[in-house]
Amino acid sequence: MLIRYYFCFLSVIISLYFQKAGAAMFFQYGEKEINYLKRKDKKLAWAIEQIGHIERRLDADLFASVVRHIVGQQISSKAQATVWARLEARLSVVTPASVHAASPEELQSLGMSLRKAEYIKDFASKIVSGEFALQAVEQLSDEEAIAAFSSLKGIGRWTAEMILLFCLQRPDILSFDDLAIQRGLRMLYHHRKITR
């Protein structure tokens, strides 16, 4: 439980790299979780008081979330939002069928690398063919879901963890290798290096 809320409160340091139009869903936590953390760590308690409640947007659609996270790898939030807007404009709705119907070159023309376009196309093809049961991932444990997502081209542990957090709202994910989380922990605890 501690890990879940460390992420919530340290996420203020991480820039939001996606925003979904329309009715927003937010990562859910309450006073019980906040009070638990405050009792466990004085520095975190101070940060919680300074930052206050954080509304962290979630992705509503699992397929679109996976595609969005592949698109957003190693680019700025602004660039990711631009590419995503172009993708939505071209496809109308980002679904396995609409992505599967597009060529990698067409996807690349929207501003992503050809490699990312191929990853997204491969992912959509696996969904359409039934080779990858996307909805079944929701029923897996965190580690099983990370392994399932990581079996796809273009998705490593970090991307899988982001999908679990920002779409599936898994409470016990701390993407320890995330540079922004590392930076946030160093700032909060005044350490040069953070280890597990």
Predicted regions and their residues:
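A broad, low-specificity signal for short, low-complexity segments enriched in glycine/proline
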Residues: 27-35, 68, 80, 84
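Alpha-helix initiation and N-capping motif
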Residues: 30-31, 41-44, 80, 178, ...
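Short helix-loop boundary/capping segments at the starts of domains
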Residues: 53, 72, 76-80, 89-93
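A short secondary-structure junction motif
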Residues: 68-79, 83, 109-116, 169
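Catalytic cores of DNA base-excision repair glycosylases
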Residues: 87-196
